[in-house]
Amino acid sequence: MSEPLKPRIDFAEPLKEEPTSAFKAQQTFSEAESRTFAPAAIDERPEDEGVAEAAVDAALRPKRSLWRKMVMGGLALFGASVVGQGVQWTMNAWQTQDWVALGGCAAGALIVGAGVGSVVTEWRRLWRLRQRAHERDEARELLHSHSVGKGRAFCEKLAQQAGIDQSHPALQRWYAAIHETQNDREIVGLYAHLVQPVLDAQARREISRFAAESTLMIAVSPLALVDMAFIAWRNLRLINRIATLYGIELGYYSRLRLFRLVLLNIAFAGASELMREVGMDWMSQDLAARLSTRAAQGIGAGLLTARLGIKAMELCRPLPWIDNDKPRLGDFRRQLIGQLKETLQKSKSSPEK
């Protein structure tokens, strides 16, 4: 006999289909491609570097607060009042033929004009430093863009700002490498690999020279006050040299602002890297036993100068770092140690002679 039919069962909720993962198409590599295969590099940017970059960006692009607008408005009203009062005094002196007062008004006008001119010049130089950050953002966008038409004009503007002549071999190689079918990303990338390294190499040489001078000065000088004054003077000179190489003319306030930004970046991200670099040397080469205390202090001062120069490069450079072309402290560490050892050996051998 056949079994009786079972009653119908109603479920409160509809059945849910289990999601099935879509399979990707199989990828095969040839023998030639397997030799050139390189795994994708994961950006392991330290958290302190990100905090430093955010702080620098906030300093370069300050928010227009209400208090700042009120102060600027008050200064503008005060300046207009001074100009109006000066015009009134000049008219009264001319009408009463008070030539002494008229001469005083003329002298005051010259002084005020010189002050206004210097303020405008400083503002223009400070604006140029801020504009470099915007150019770096624009270059970063072009390096990730597939559009056409902006890359060449942007790179030519950077070359003109840096004072690179049209007949320069690096710029000529760049012109020979680009063509109309390339997009902005490829054109800016070629500029970063062919023209920008010329300026970067000059900046590296300046950093090496100033770092070596700081190392040797601290190692041989017995006066701490002289050391501090020398290091401060040489660091400011280094910032000026790097800014000039990258086509930025620094005024008084822009120089102080750049120096503050560099120190801010070092305070956030420089201490850990500096201690790591010095620790590697001391552990691997036992420098603490071979060098004197003054020599060790000289190496520390030289590495700090190098760190300051690297950060000044980063703030003055019109292009972001690509393909791990950013200089590291290790690039200057071995050079500083070698120069210091050579100097100490010469100083020890000279009395024997």
From Swiss-Prot:
Keyword Transmembrane helix applies: yes
Main location: membrane
Membrane protein topology class: Multi-pass membrane protein
One GO CC term on file: plasma membrane
Domain of life: Bacteria
Chain spans, region Disordered: 1-35
A family per Pfam: DUF697
TM segment ranges: 70-90, 100-120, 213-233
InterPro entries, sorted: DUF697, UPF0283
Subcellular location: Cell inner membrane
Family per similarity comment: Belongs to the UPF0283 family.
Protein name: UPF0283 membrane protein YcjF
Organism, as annotated: Salmonella paratyphi B (strain ATCC BAA-1250 / SPB7)
